[in-house]
């Protein structure tokens, strides 16, 4: 058929591969290129190569005909049959080209501006109504049927920060002078990264119990520990209460962690409540199978570093899990105390204590890493599942590469959980431990768009774990849902946590009320 391809500004570069494919498929391609002046009409020779006809339009008449792009498009429509119109360029140009095509009953497609902050639909910056349904340009587009686009809504969303941006442009921002802290390497170099010195990175902690003699010694003190208190005495000990920030002070900050953490004395007292069951059902309730009685009894014994070491044998994120895992539905829900109408042992609090103690002591160690298998494994997403999988695989000797769509590693741990619940510095330490163990991280990479699964396979990856997370929010389809400053919980949390939008000095602040 006959296709009119209307390109404006840098949209000409975007439309070139499309018109090329249309021409190669046997279509008649008529290209209408536009700009304010000759200097802004780019890639004309490239477009001519794959077009049956090229019409140039400039606002000032310095190149081709004088007029806007719709003038050139309408001339073509009036002289011959057109089967399709495609427009890529400034939003206002796409809107009126689409309206023109609609006027003549011609199907038309536009390529919308993703106004992308994160490229995953999490920030909501490109959320629009398309055909009465909520869509994200960065995920569902960028090409859409122009007749279905709510253009008024789109222009309102694009102007959300217009006034703020104008003010910022007038005053130099000192932050612009700071260098980026990105250190991720190019995708093309993933297979060529220098291998981590495994002997150094897996320098095993001094406290790791591995010899028969050490095991026998532990069994001796474990037996003695059990005899110190009778089960009834242990169950009679009240469950520890987590110390918290003073409410009056808490109201003045959103970055300081509300739960302060246990003292060593509190942790040892809570550890006494554990009955050291011969068949611990709490372990069955733990998704990663942490040796719960083992690490708790080491806390009761006062050996906090060994408790942390035991945690890291099976968990890649002990400091994180100790804070945000739903222990009340997992390990603690299987605690024997509950059968005796007593509160469960505070397993989560103790896990956090051991991990925090090791970090704050400055004596952090790494778990054992098996000799390299030479097998490369890709992980899609750096949220809790991706990081946990990466930790498990690197300990087994696999070469693990984690691909993250956002600009920071951590997934929901960074964008979805406020810092007063889970500080970023805690997450960063866990990530750094994985990096020291040999895990490679690549940010700003959307698997499926930036790089495909087939390309990963071509790069030598023998296994691919997809931990992309829950993703997009669900919408109810009610009137006003896509109005400006109406945010889903995902969008709100992403902007506040990952983009510091609660700070009015940031690029994309949240202004509510």
What are these regions, as identified by a protein language model?
Residues 1-117:
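FNR/FR-type flavoprotein reductase catalytic core
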Residues 2-4, 9, 13, 357-396:
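Extended interfacial segments that mediate partner engagement and assembly in macromolecular machines
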Residues 5, 87, 466, 488, ...:
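Redox-cofactor binding/interface segments in oxidoreductases and associated redox assembly factors
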Residues 9-12, 91-92, 122, 316, ...:
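Residue-level detector of alpha-helix initiation sites
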Residues 15, 21, 272, 279, ...:
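Rossmann-like dinucleotide/flavin-binding elements
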Residues 107-125, 492-501:
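Short, flexible loop segments at boundaries between secondary-structure elements
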Residues 142, 150-200, 205-373, 424, ...:
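Ferredoxin-type iron-sulfur electron-transfer modules and their immediate structural context
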Residues 308-318, 350, 412-461:
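N-terminal Rossmann-like dinucleotide/flavin-binding domain of flavoprotein oxidoreductases
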């Amino acid at each position: 058929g006959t296709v009119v391809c209307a390109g404006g500004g840098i949209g000409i570069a975007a439309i070139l591969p499309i018109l090329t494919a249309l021409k190669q498929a046997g279509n008649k391609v008529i290209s209408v290129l536009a700009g304010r002046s000759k200097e802004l009409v780019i890639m004309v020779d490239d477009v001519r190569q794959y077009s049956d006809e090229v019409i140039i339009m400039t606002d000032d008449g310095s190149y081709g005909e004088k007029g806007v792009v719709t003038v050139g498009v309408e001339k073509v429509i009036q002289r011959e049959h057109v089967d399709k119109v495609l427009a890529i360029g400034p939003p206002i140009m796409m809107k009126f080209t689409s309206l023109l095509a609609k006027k003549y009953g011609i199907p038309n497609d536009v390529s919308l501006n993703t106004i992308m902050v994160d490229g995953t639909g999490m920030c909501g910056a490109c959320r629009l109504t398309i055909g009465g349904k909520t869509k994200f340009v960065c995920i569902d587009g960028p090409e859409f049927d122009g007749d279905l686009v709510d253009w008024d809504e789109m222009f309102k969303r694009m102007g959300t920060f217009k006034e703020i941006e104008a003010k910022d442009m007038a005053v130099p921002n000192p932050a612009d002078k700071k260098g980026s802290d990105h250190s991720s390497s190019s995708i093309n170099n993933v297979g060529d990264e220098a291998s981590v010195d495994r002997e150094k990175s897996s320098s095993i902690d001094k406290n790791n119990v591995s010899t028969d003699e050490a095991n026998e010694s532990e069994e001796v003190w474990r037996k003695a520990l059990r005899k110190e208190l009778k089960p009834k005495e242990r169950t009679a000990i009240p469950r520890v209460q987590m110390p918290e920030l003073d409410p009056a002070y808490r109201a003045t900050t959103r970055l300081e962690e509300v739960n302060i953490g246990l003292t060593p004395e509190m942790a040892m007292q809570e550890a006494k409540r554990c009955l050291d069951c011969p068949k611990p059902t709490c372990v069955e309730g733990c998704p990663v199978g942490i040796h719960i009685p083992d690490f708790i009894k080491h806390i009761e014994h006062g050996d906090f570093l060994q408790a942390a070491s035991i945690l890291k044998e099976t968990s890649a994120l002990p400091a994180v899990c100790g804070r945000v895992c739903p222990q009340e539905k997992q390990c603690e829900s299987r605690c024997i105390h509950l059968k005796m109408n007593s509160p469960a042992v505070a397993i989560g609090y103790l896990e956090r204590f051991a991990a925090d103690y090791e970090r704050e002591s400055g004596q952090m160690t790494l778990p054992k890493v098996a000799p390299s298998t030479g097998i490369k494994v890709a992980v899609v997403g750096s949220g809790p599942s991706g990081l946990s999988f990466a930790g498990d695989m690197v300990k087994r000797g696999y070469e693990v590469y984690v691909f993250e769509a956002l600009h920071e590693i951590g997934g929901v741990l960074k964008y979805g959980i406020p810092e007063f619940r889970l500080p970023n510095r805690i997450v960063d330490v866990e990530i750094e431990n994985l990096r020291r163990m040999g895990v490679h991280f690549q940010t700003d990479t959307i698997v499926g768009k930036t790089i495909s699964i087939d390309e990963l396979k071509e790069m030598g990856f023998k296994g691919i774990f997809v931990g992309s997370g829950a993703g997009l929010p669900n919408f109810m389809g009610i009137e006003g849902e896509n109005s400006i400053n109406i945010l889903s919980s995902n969008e709100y949390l992403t902007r506040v946590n990952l983009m510091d939008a609660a700070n009015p000095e940031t690029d994309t602040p949240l202004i509510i009320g």
